A protein has these predicted regions:
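Ribokinase/PfkB-type carbohydrate-kinase core domain
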Residues: 1-216
Length: 216
């Protein structure tokens, strides 16, 4: 298997300026097969008819369904669409990627994080931006250095991770251990995540497989 065989779907706002689209764009540039789903051209994202999305067909045969937690703050329709996509995607065998970022209104992070917690058993890769790592650490009252491991243990998420651009460091807590690894060059956090999920399906198992994906 190669990156060109990796299939993923991302859901986000029609402006295409959110984290889900960014991951899709990075992955597309690496050769993955990507599709971005949003509302119709003449619809408002906050209240579009999310029932028009055929999630069963859209997620059939894909590796990853990508969502960003702050999407649910855009309105009831996006929130319902994220939930429906995760439910149907899980039934179709897709694995869920969830990005946690500090929203534009930072006080809303408790809402977006609450949604993540409510769906945490459906998530396969949970990624925190560095800003979100600090914010959730304060919200959960868990030291930042322990946060990824604590969340993985609580939620049984297979991969809980972050990337620190200044240190060129990827940190992954996974079901078989922990990995902290320095990449060859400094990457943007979402650029690293795109590389990680593009390489993870064929990088092998255990710590070595995770390390290989981290450096992909």
């Amino acid at each position: 298997m190669s990156v060109s065989e990796i299939k993923m779907v991302a859901f986000g706002n029609p402006k295409r300026n959110d984290n889900a689209f960014t991951i899709s764009s990075y992955s597309d540039s690496m050769g993955a097969q990507t599709r971005f789903i949003t509302c119709g051209d003449n619809e408002s994202f906050s209240n579009f008819n999310h029932g028009n999305i055929d999630w069963r067909n859209s997620t059939n045969g894909i590796h990853w369904l990508i969502n960003s937690a702050e999407t649910i703050l855009s309105g009831e329709s996006p929130k319902s669409a994220v939930g429906a996509g995760m439910t149907f995607g899980e039934l179709e065998g897709a694995k869920m990627v969830m990005i946690v970022e500090v929203p534009e209104k930072s006080e809303d992070i408790s809402k977006s994080w609450g949604f993540v917690i409510s769906r945490i058993r459906q998530i396969h890769v949970l990624f925190f931006t560095p800003r979100a790592l600090d914010a959730i650490s304060k919200l959960e009252q868990i030291p930042v250095e322990n946060l990824l491991k604590e969340i993985r243990n609580r939620g049984l998420v297979p991969h809980v991770c972050t990337y620190l651009s200044d240190e060129k460091k990827a940190i992954v807590e996974h079901s078989m251990g922990s990995v902290s690894i320095i990449t060859k060059k400094s990457l943007q956090p979402l650029e690293w995540l795109a590389r990680y999920i593009c390489n993870l399906p064929f990088s092998g198992i255990g710590n070595l497989g995770v390390k290989n994906a981290c450096l992909g």
